[in-house]
């Protein structure tokens, strides 16, 4: 069961940031990785055995080959650890606190949910739920309030994963800011409740790197780092088609051509804050509303046919972020 904090989001002042998440990003078999791999090489993962079900779930995600490989490493470590324990060999406990870096709409929250359930199934976590928070949920208004709020969210995350979005914002106010108290409380909980919950700090790549550099004691506490690269244009078109299909809509070839132009323009305009699949979702939702208006205008007293009810035409992409 997922818990989500309901409170106003905080934003970095240097860039205009989108303010909504997308948690479901699907893939097709031809998806390609968006950027060269760095710390973890893509590999062919097994499609049989105990891993098969997790592989099937990861296969539904577009791209993210580097991330998927790292998820498999975690699984392999735990699986072999169980084998070592059964053989009477030493099987030391591992730390699974993580850093997720990347732009919005690249699947960070979705992967966090999968990891929470994976760690529960392997005996690391007792519940496997995900609790999402941000700065406004953790930081209070007076001395002591922040620690109280932060401890309450940690309590809710026990047995699962605490996912702190835009974690870098906790350090934006300097030494006197209450965000530092939230960081200190999180670090203390990592020590006091070792192996009782997993902490994931997530945010934009550059901001997260600066955040870790400004807190010398933090990097060593997060041995697992995942970078979520922006999707390629082709991958975003695949995501759009799959999102539409899930809702029983069809994007016509001309519609896909126009959408591709929109994606390219948006990516060029927002080099450091492109919202990836979130942008696709927002465009699709606006197009569906436009289609509904168009059909009512065309059939004031009749009923459109089945195909007409499904088709999203190029003109349905009008009035979407300045596009006509």
Question: Across the structure, where does each feature detected by a protein language model lie?
Answer:
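C-terminal alpha-helical "lid" subdomain
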Residues: 2-53, 57, 238, 243-250, ...
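Pre-Walker A (pre-P-loop) alpha-helix and adjacent loop at the N terminus of AAA/AAA+ ATPase modules
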Residues: 53-96
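Walker A/P-loop
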Residues: 89-128, 152-155, 222
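Short glycine-rich substrate-engagement loop in P-loop NTPases that contacts/grips substrate
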Residues: 127-157
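Flexible beta-alpha connector loops of hexameric P-loop NTPases
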Residues: 135-146, 169-180, 225-227
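Conserved nucleotide-sensing/catalytic segment adjacent to the nucleotide-binding pocket
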Residues: 154-174
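Conserved catalytic/switch belt of AAA+ P-loop NTPases
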Residues: 168-200, 213-217
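A short helix-turn-beta junction within AAA+ P-loop NTPase domains corresponding to the substrate/partner-engaging
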Residues: 213-229
């Amino acid at each position: 069961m997922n818990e989500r904090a309901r409170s106003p989001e905080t934003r970095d002042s240097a860039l205009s940031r989108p303010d909504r998440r997308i948690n479901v990003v699907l893939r097709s078999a031809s998806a390609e990785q968006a950027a060269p791999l760095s710390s973890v090489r893509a590999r062919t993962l097994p499609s049989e055995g105990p891993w098969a079900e997790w592989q099937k779930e990861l296969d539904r995600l577009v791209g993210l080959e580097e991330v998927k490989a790292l998820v498999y490493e975690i699984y392999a470590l735990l699986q072999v650890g169980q084998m070592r324990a059964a053989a009477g060999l030493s099987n030391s406990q591992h730390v699974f606190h993580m850093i997720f870096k990347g732009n919005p709409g690249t699947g960070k929250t979705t992967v966090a949910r999968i990891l929470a359930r994976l760690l529960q199934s392997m005996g690391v976590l007792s519940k496997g739920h995900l609790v999402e928070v941000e700065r406004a949920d953790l930081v209070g208004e007076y001395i002591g309030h922040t620690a109280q709020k932060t401890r309450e969210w940690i309590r809710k995350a026990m047995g699962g994963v605490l996912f702190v979005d835009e974690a870098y914002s906790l350090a934006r106010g300097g030494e006197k800011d209450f965000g530092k108290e939230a960081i200190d409380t999180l670090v203390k909980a990592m020590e006091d409740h070792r192996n009782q919950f997993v902490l994931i700090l997530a945010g934009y790549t550059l901001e997260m790197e600066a955040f870790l550099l400004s807190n010398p004691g933090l990097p060593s506490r997060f041995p697992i780092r995942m970078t979520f690269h922006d999707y390629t244009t082709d991958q975003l078109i695949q995501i759009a088609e799959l999102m539409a299909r899930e809702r029983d809509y069809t994007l016509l070839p001309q519609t896909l051509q126009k959408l591709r132009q929109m994606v390219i323009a948006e990516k060029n305009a927002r080099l450091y804050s492109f919202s990836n699949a979130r942008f696709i979702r927002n465009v699709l939702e606006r197009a569906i509303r436009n289609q509904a208006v168009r059909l009512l205008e065309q059939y004031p007293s009749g009923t459109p046919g089945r195909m007409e009810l499904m088709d999203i035409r190029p003109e349905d992409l009008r009035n979407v972020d300045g596009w006509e």
